[in-house]
C-alpha cells in the first residue's frame, strides 16, 4: 500500500481533522515552520544528504513562514537557517523564487488599496476569480499587517465558485481559531 507509512511534521495548531494513522507525529507549535523542523531533524541524522537544492527549498520555507525572519523567529530558526546556508542555500536565489508576475502584483495592490479596517482587523474582498488569485490574496493579507493599528487581516476571494479566506495576524489574534468557527 502506497500510503501505509505516514509521517506528519507540523507547526500549526492541532486541528480536529488530524491525521490519525501517522507512524510518527512530530508537532512543535513553537517552531517557525515545518521547514525549520525538518532541518533540525536532518542535522541529527548522520546520513543526512541535504544538497544545495534541498537546502534552498527548506530555507525558502523558513523565509516564507517567517515573512523573511520577522514573525515567529527564535534562536532555532536562525540556527537552522545558518545550517542551510552552510549546505549551499543561496538567499538571492530564494528571493527570486518569490518574484511575482505584474498581474499578481496589480491584484495584490488592488486588494490592499480596497481594504477596510474594523476593530484592528483589515478586511479586503476580491470581485474577480482568475489567475493567481490565491497568491495575490495571501500576499495582500501579509501586506495589510504592515498598516499601523492592524493586528489581523482577512482577504476574501473567489476560486472555482467557492469563497476562500486568507488570514494573517501578528500573533495577538488567533486567526486559525476564528476561521475554524
Predicted features and spans:
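Short alpha-helices
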Residues: 11-82
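Hydrophobic helix-and-loop "lid/oligomerization" segment in the mid-to-C-terminal part
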Residues: 59, 64-181
Amino acid at each position: 500500500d502506497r500510503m501505509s507509512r505516514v509521517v506528519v511534521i507540523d507547526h500549526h495548531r492541532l486541528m480536529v481533522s488530524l491525521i490519525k494513522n501517522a507512524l510518527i507525529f512530530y508537532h512543535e507549535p513553537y517552531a517557525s515552520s515545518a521547514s525549520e523542523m525538518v532541518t533540525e531533524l536532518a542535522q541529527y541524522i548522520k546520513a543526512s544528504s541535504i544538497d544545495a537544492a534541498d537546502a534552498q527549498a527548506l530555507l525558502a520555507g523558513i523565509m516564507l513562514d517567517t515573512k523573511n525572519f520577522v514573525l515567529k523567529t527564535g534562536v532555532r530558526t536562525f540556527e537552522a537557517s545558518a545550517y542551510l546556508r552552510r549546505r549551499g542555500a543561496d538567499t538571492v536565489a530564494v528571493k527570486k523564487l518569490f518574484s511575482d508576475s505584474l498581474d499578481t502584483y496589480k491584484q495584490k495592490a488592488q486588494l490592499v488599496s480596497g481594504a477596510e479596517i474594523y476593530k484592528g482587523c483589515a478586511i479586503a474582498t476580491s470581485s474577480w476569480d482568475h489567475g493567481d488569485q490565491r497568491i495575490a490574496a495571501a500576499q495582500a493579507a501579509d501586506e495589510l499587517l504592515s498598516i499601523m493599528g492592524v493586528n489581523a487581516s482577512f482577504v476574501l476571494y473567489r476560486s472555482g465558485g467557492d469563497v476562500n479566506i486568507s488570514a494573517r495576524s501578528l500573533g495577538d489574534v488567533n486567526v486559525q481559531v476564528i476561521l475554524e468557527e
